[in-house]
Regions:
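Non-catalytic cap/lid and distal C-terminal segments of serine-dependent acyl enzymes
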Residues: 2-240
Length: 240
């Protein structure tokens, strides 16, 4: 009988100087790091049914999904601190994901890479991580993502902001691994982030970076369409 294993992890992150919580779904398979939406918890993707939409892949041992919590409340959405500290907090979060999660699980694959995914602002996290670390990422699935962080920075601009703003740093990217990545920008004509996806698609196209701009029809920026997209996109992973 097939089953979907669920495990809870909590550890002290040296990069963030705080505790991090994470759910892991599956007993074996290709690693997928799945980010929550804005200020979301590690259990949000389970609560909203996104994990359930991928149950077949999980039960078959084809994928393992890693769901860390975000620190958006202390980075992009923390208006009580200066933008310098907001982006620094996010930079440390990126290091945590890279060194404490991805580097530990990517050796489970023959390619030494992982897939990353997320909905809404989780799509930003997935895209930004993938494009900053293309040597670690084989697939990037953004569903209803928005990719500019300028609105969070109150006019502040520095290197940390630049190198966490995909539409700004992609034009100068030279890591050949990004041309080998399976990139999907999932959106719809009713999506509030539709224009953001068109813009990022244009940025990628100008660098001749292969990608799929998947535009669904008459669907809102919400979980129902993301639960349709996610299992569809997972089918693109070469599991063996």
């Amino acid at each position: 009988m097939k089953f979907m294993r669920e495990e809870y992890f909590k550890w002290y992150s040296p990069n963030l100087n705080r505790e991090i919580e994470m759910l892991v779904f599956g007993h074996a398979g290709y690693p997928v790091s799945l980010f929550p939406t804005s200020m979301g918890s590690y259990h949000e993707n389970k609560d909203q049914g996104l994990i359930e939409s991928a149950r077949w892949y999980i039960e078959q041992g084809l994928i393992q999904i890693f769901c860390p919590n975000s620190i958006d409340k202390d980075s992009f959405y923390n208006k009580k601190i200066h933008p310098v500290h907001r982006i620094q907090n996010h930079t440390w979060y990126d290091k945590m994901v890279c060194h404490e999660i991805v580097e530990r699980v990517r050796n489970n694959t023959s390619s030494g890479k992982v897939a990353v995914a997320g909905c809404s602002f989780g799509g930003y996290h997935a895209a930004n991580f993938a494009f900053k670390h293309p040597g670690y990422v084989s697939h990037m699935f953004s569903m209803g993502g928005a990719f500019s962080i300028k609105s969070f920075m109150d006019g502040h601009w520095d290197d940390d902001v630049f190198y966490n703003s995909p539409e700004d740093y992609i034009p100068g990217i030279n890591d050949h691994e990004i041309w080998n990545m399976d990139i999907i920008l999932g959106t719809s004509n009713w999506d509030i982030c539709y224009d953001a996806n068109l813009k990022l698609s244009g940025v990628l196209a100008r660098r001749d970076i292969p990608h799929w701009l998947d535009v669904r029809q008459d669907r809102e920026h919400d979980w129902p369409v993301w639960k349709e997209m996610f299992p569809h996109y997972l089918s693109r992973i070469k599991f063996f």
